[in-house]
């Protein structure tokens, strides 16, 4: 099961069965993905659950509580964070409201930057999970494989913090 709170081209996904993909609700709700992943695992304990989420949504999703519940209820979930060290939603809405405003003139828009980026992989470790930070493309697949091994074999939660290039829309 894939709980996705990150922009995705759904047509590129290889998901063919109904009920295997849960995407952004039309009503919004930044941070909903982590709680939804817990619910998906509770509803389908025999299925693997992956939560793909941006760094801003991860922070909004109350990660300490999520990882605590995952450990306490023995819900092995893989969390994959696309970490570009910014709140894209905040930046986009600010630019749409004030296209020539203060934020549009800055290299690092106020209230949209998440730099320095927290070490999210440490948050999951506080609740008995496996956490890794990926900074190079060649590290990604091995990190995902190690994380899935923890989820499948050790029945623990895992998190891969994928650090992306920081960029801002002008």
How should each PLM-predicted stretch be described?
Residues 1-3:
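Active-site pocket-lining segments that scaffold enzyme catalytic pockets across diverse folds
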Residues 9-170:
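Thiamine diphosphate
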